[in-house]
């Protein structure tokens, strides 16, 4: 599969990107969810957390848990963050999951989201594909750039990309678990996520 693209709560910016990706037929070979009211698209049971019924997913909780198979069966995460405003960067468990899974990622989030990640010591994939969407302050134009990027990514040689980014992805994984290194920048969300990982609540 191409993308892993998970959407839970319906938000305007998520609906806009989802519709654009569907209109461009970019999700045809992807694993994705979208919780619309009339026709929710859910994960196949084999990709869901153990003990979870995809048709009765809890509205709250379970967001910090992670299961490995969806990341193994896809090459790139489209991270659908909580908001896309241009005045603050708000990171949630949605970005830490692909980092923990050593997955390549594209982020639909705030203006300068990737820049903030870099300030925290992480690396992104600007040497391998266009990340100029992060510099686009207008949310609608940012979506345009993400859609264009996703179309380009579907044509990439992913075996080469994963070989070339192995050290980068390992660096991000190590950085995520280096609490001392991140002590000045880390936010409450990743600390909570690490508590789940350390206590064995992260499913594999």
What spans do the regions from the language model cover?
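Pol beta-like nucleotidyltransferase catalytic core
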Residues: 1-79, 85-92, 96-204
């Amino acid at each position: 599969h191409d993308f892993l693209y998970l959407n839970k709560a319906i938000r305007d910016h998520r609906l806009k990107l989802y519709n654009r990706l569907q209109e461009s037929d970019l999700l045809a070979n992807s694993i994705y969810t979208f919780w619309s009211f009339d026709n929710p698209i859910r994960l196949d049971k084999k990709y869901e957390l153990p003990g979870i019924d995809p048709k009765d997913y809890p509205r709250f909780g379970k967001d910090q848990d992670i299961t490995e198979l969806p990341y193994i069966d896809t090459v790139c995460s489209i991270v659908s963050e909580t908001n896309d405003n241009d005045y603050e960067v708000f990171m949630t468990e949605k970005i830490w999951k692909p980092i923990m899974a050593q997955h390549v990622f594209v982020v639909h989030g705030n203006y300068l989201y990737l820049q903030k990640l870099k300030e925290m010591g992480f690396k992104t994939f600007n040497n391998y594909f266009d990340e100029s969407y992060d510099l686009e302050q207008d949310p609608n134009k940012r979506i345009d750039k993400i859609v264009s990027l996703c179309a380009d990514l579907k044509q990439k040689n992913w075996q080469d990309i994963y070989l070339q980014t192995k050290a980068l992805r390992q660096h991000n994984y190590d950085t995520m678990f280096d609490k001392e290194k991140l002590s000045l920048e880390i936010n409450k969300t990743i600390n909570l996520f690490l508590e789940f990982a350390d206590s064995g609540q992260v499913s594999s």
